[in-house]
Amino acid sequence: SKDKLHTLYKLLCSFTGGQSIVFCNHRESVDRVAAYLREQKIFFEAYHGGMEQEVRERALYKFRCGSSNVLVSTDLAARGLDIPEVQHIIHYHLPGSEEAYIHRTGRTARWDADGCSYLILHSEERVPEYLTTGVDDYLLPERAARPQPPLWTTLYIGKGKKDKINKVDIAGFLY
């Protein structure tokens, strides 16, 4: 488990940009990976069905608008989400079926964009039979710098018309 976490960290550090989704099979695994990435000072958002709806929506919003470059999720994020420009799909756990693999990997390379899918395998795990072609080893660099923080920050203001606050007030405050 620690080996896979360290491998995930090195893999994320090897990317020179772009957004990544890390897929885990269980909510507890998402929480464990999130705790590790937090320790390593990686900017990320977690997303799974055990979270409150509002928290999940904020996580997706931050990921979509570029305030976070990594989304750690269960298969909840594998279907029905419209997230353009995801360049890296990381299967921290092997998907349970070929269909799950297809849906997870389908989050990248959308609309003629380029993208890659990565499997992090423990020494006792093997590449699934449905992936017998087109699988290459990815050699991780010995040393790589921690990923840069996102260029954007999301500012959430839970106020609106009822509170007599509008866009101009916020823009004036930030300027």
Name the predicted role of every residue range.
Residues 30-36, 42-74:
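Conserved helicase ATPase core of P-loop NTP-dependent helicases/translocases
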Residues 1-4, 26-30, 51-53, 76-79, ...:
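Conserved nucleotide-binding/hydrolysis micro-motifs of P-loop NTPases
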Residues 1-36, 173:
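Conserved interdomain hinge at the start of the Helicase C-terminal
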Residues 60, 70-92, 99, 111:
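P-loop/Walker A NTP-binding module and the surrounding RecA-like catalytic core of P-loop NTPases
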Residues 70, 79, 97-138:
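Conserved segment of the helicase C-terminal RecA-like domain
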Residues 140-175:
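Non-catalytic terminal extensions of ATP-dependent helicases
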Residues 16-18, 40-43, 68, 84-88, ...:
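Short glycine-/polar-rich loops that comprise or flank the Walker A/P-loop
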Residues 12-16, 36-39, 61-65, 81-82, ...:
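Conserved catalytic network of the ASCE P-loop NTPase/AAA+ motor domain
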